[in-house]
Design a protein with these regions (language model features):
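Extreme N-terminal starter segment of soluble prokaryotic enzymes
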Residues: 2-6, 41
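ATP-dependent small-molecule kinase phosphotransfer cores
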Residues: 37-41, 46-120
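Conserved lysine of the Walker
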Residues: 16
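Post-Walker A helix-loop "phosphate-sensing" segment adjacent to the P-loop in P-loop NTPases
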Residues: 25-42
Length: 200
């Protein structure tokens, strides 16, 4: 069995989380040489480790965190985070504590160690450095970056950006999300199926 990685790389509000939830319910069939694989998808996030560390630093339980890390509240200041919003707290821990003191690849290393056999769907790509351990773990040929276009969505005010796939040497595809969810999901599935069945 092979580890495959599909990384969604898109601005907030563009539909990447919805696409990942849709793919988790899918099974993909593809051939490698003379072997046919039928794989389900597993959801992974670079920020999984970051969430755990941030909760620990601010002494916040998982239940408390989950109550506040919602679309409505994640931008709202919270006294348990010393007046930071949950999103600001994540950026503070990542950019001011972990990366300067450990490595810019820290969260990528953590994710690479936790990959499943089969198809891993990563919903929060946005830093080139975090991709390096993943590339080392599975190989460039086993990674697809899905970038999403949606009107009105940008990385403005976000520490993430579009991955430099040319520099990283990995494949990318663009999917438009300016129509219905049905069309969007169909395009995402076709993009992943097309990549899985490419001659490698």
């Amino acid at each position: 069995m092979i580890e495959k990685v599909v990384v969604f790389n898109a601005p907030p509000g563009s539909g990447k989380d919805e696409a990942c939830k849709w793919l988790i319910n899918k099974t993909f069939t593809y051939d490698v040489g003379d072997t046919r694989y039928s794989e389900s998808c597993h959801h992974k996030e670079f920020k999984g480790k970051l969430f755990a560390i941030t909760r620990e630093i601010f002494s916040v339980s998982k239940d408390e965190w989950d109550e506040h890390y919602t679309r409505e509240l994640k931008e709202v200041a919270w006294d348990k985070l010393n007046g930071l919003s949950p999103r600001q707290a994540l950026i503070f821990v990542s950019e001011d504590i972990i990366k300067p003191n450990f490595s810019k690849t820290y969260f990528g290393e953590s994710l690479a160690k936790s990959l499943y056999q089969g198809i891993n769907i990563i919903s929060d790509g946005g830093f080139d450095e975090e991709m390096l351990p993943v590339i080392e773990a599975v190989g460039k040929e086993n990674i697809l970056v899905v970038k999403i276009k949606r009107d009105g969505c940008s990385f403005e005010g976000d520490s993430r950006s579009f991955l430099n796939t040319d520099k990283l040497g990995i494949m990318e595809t663009w999917v438009d999300n300016n129509s219905t969810l049905e069309v969007f999901f169909t395009n995402v599935v076709e993009a992943v199926e097309g990549w899985l069945n490419l001659e490698k």
